Amino acid sequence: MYNVIFLGAPGSGKGTQGEVVAKELRLAHMATGDLFRKAIERGDELGDTVKSYMERGELVPDEITISVVLKHLAGLKDVSGIILDGFPRSLRQAEALDEALVKQGEGIGRVIYINVPEDELVRRLSGRWVCRSCQSPYQCGCAEVAEGKCSRCQGELYQRPDDTPETVKERLKVYFSKTAPLIEYYRSKGKLSEIDGMAEITEVTKRIVSAIKCGK
């Protein structure tokens, strides 16, 4: 199985790119944020715990994240590969993933780092609205946000609690202190491909696909 990690700060576009690239390359797509939001929707103890961290802009503790993700990965069947979006987010998570994959006789094929300047990240996140049904993102000022309706599935748009200006600053602070070190971790292993996230969306997709294919 060919495993690809998407790294990037909140607002870098890794979620959008993960979905598009997964479809193009026929890979499974796992977004940690989606797994957590499903837990929150269930309203169980795990969901309540996850919600409290996400609303403060903090990372969900490693032990919880590792358990949720590895359980999900173990349940995947008949897939040729997977794009991991939002995991790992710390060196401890990266080491846990490496260990789990080695036990299965697998490894990381390629790590895609989508690089976007911090001021642009703040702009994107503070103005981001998301569809409750399909999770499609929209920027403040577009027709869909004005109407409050998703153009893809007609679902209701809302602003996530973790996308408010105050929480955005905390999320980025956490990212640069805990997740950014993974860039050098994977670069040292010769697995990292850095992509300019300021390019047009279609161009970013093209560069990511090329990097993954070249890394195989």
Curated annotation (Swiss-Prot):
Xref: Pfam families: ADK
GO biological process, one term: AMP salvage
Localization per record: Cytoplasm
InterPro entries noted in UniProt: Adenyl_kin_sub, Adenylat/UMP-CMP_kin, Adenylat_kinase_CS, P-loop_NTPase
List of residues binding Zn(2+): 131, 134, 150, 153
Residue numbers binding ATP: 11-16, 128, 199
Keywords noted in UniProt: ATP-binding, Cytoplasm, Kinase, Metal-binding, Nucleotide biosynthesis, Nucleotide-binding, Transferase, Zinc
Signal peptide interval: none
Positions annotated to bind AMP: 32, 37, 58-60, 86-89, 93, 160, 171
NCBIfam families registered for this protein in UniProt: adk, PRK00279.1-2, PRK00279.1-3, PRK14527.1
Domain notes: Consists of three domains, a large central CORE domain and two small peripheral domains, NMPbind and LID, which undergo movements during catalysis. The LID domain closes over the site of phosphoryl transfer upon ATP binding. Assembling and dissambling the active center during each catalytic cycle provides an effective means to prevent ATP hydrolysis. Some bacteria have evolved a zinc-coordinating structure that stabilizes the LID domain.
Assigned protein family: Belongs to the adenylate kinase family.
Protein's UniProt name: Adenylate kinase
Phylogenetic lineage: Bacteria, Bacillati, Chloroflexota, Dehalococcoidia, Dehalococcoidales
